[in-house]
Regions:
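Polytopic transmembrane helical bundles with strong interfacial aromatic enrichment
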Residues: 152-153
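N-terminal beta1-alpha1-beta2 submodule of the flavodoxin-like/Rossmannoid cofactor-binding fold
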Residues: 1-95, 161, 168-171, 179-190
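Short, glycine-/small-residue-rich phosphate/pyrophosphate-handling segment
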Residues: 107-145, 161
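Short acidic capping loops at alpha-helix termini that bridge into adjacent secondary structure
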Residues: 35, 104-105
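Short, conserved loop/helix-junction motifs that constitute active-site signature segments
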Residues: 99-103
């Protein structure tokens, strides 16, 4: 059975963004009952700073988290936007992952920021990093703001619809591409 991993790309306590990525993961699961889903919250794990060691050389949760990430078949990655970029915690996780760990896998993206000024951050910061890994990316993204929520719950119909469509699109993209890579491996992986 294929596995979809939702990644809550921050160490802050689960809240609105966690709720949103769970909604997208649930929609993916509902679109194909044969997939297994999991949600990884980076704040639940002690992940060392990437320093070039092999994963098994770390004494904390690093190797376990890397195994969970690289063994998944598809992803929905959510990140808050801080200072016009995705989180350092997510960047650190990506720094640990070998290219072949993500290559040829489907992925959808969710960003959340305080204002609409940071909407393009996911496209200009995170998308190029994942493209370098050879990830098959759903063309659009979901961008959320505080006004989409009320009492911590997502209430904006357009945002809810976008998350549901993103979940379904990741499953469809995974089915369409299988394990097909999107081109040659990056120079650094050779």
């Amino acid at each position: 059975m294929p596995t979809l991993l939702g990644i809550h790309g921050t160490v802050t306590s689960p809240g609105r963004l966690h709720h949103a990525v769970q909604m997208a993961v649930d929609a993916a699961s509902a679109s194909n009952l044969e997939i297994t889903t999991n949600l990884l919250h980076l704040g639940d794990h002690q992940i060392s700073f990437a320093d070039g060691r092999p994963a098994e050389a770390y004494a904390d949760d690093t190797a376990k988290v890397l195994e969970q990430v690289t063994s998944a078949d598809m992803y929905i990655i959510a990140t808050p936007i801080f200072r016009a970029s995705f989180t350092g915690a997510l960047k650190n996780l990506l720094d640990h992952i070998p290219v072949e760990g993500l290559m040829g896998k489907a992925c959808g993206l969710i960003g959340m920021g305080a204002t609409d000024h940071h909407y393009l951050t996911v496209d200009t910061q995170l998308r190029p990093v994942l493209a370098w890994f050879g990830v098959h990316l759903v063309p659009g993204q979901v961008y959320l703001q505080s006004q989409h929520f009320q009492d911590g719950k997502l209430v904006d119909a357009k945002a809810i619809g976008g998350l549901q469509e993103l979940g379904r699109a990741v499953v469809a993209l995974n089915a369409a591409t299988g394990s097909c890579t999107s081109g040659p491996a990056p120079l650094a992986s050779g």
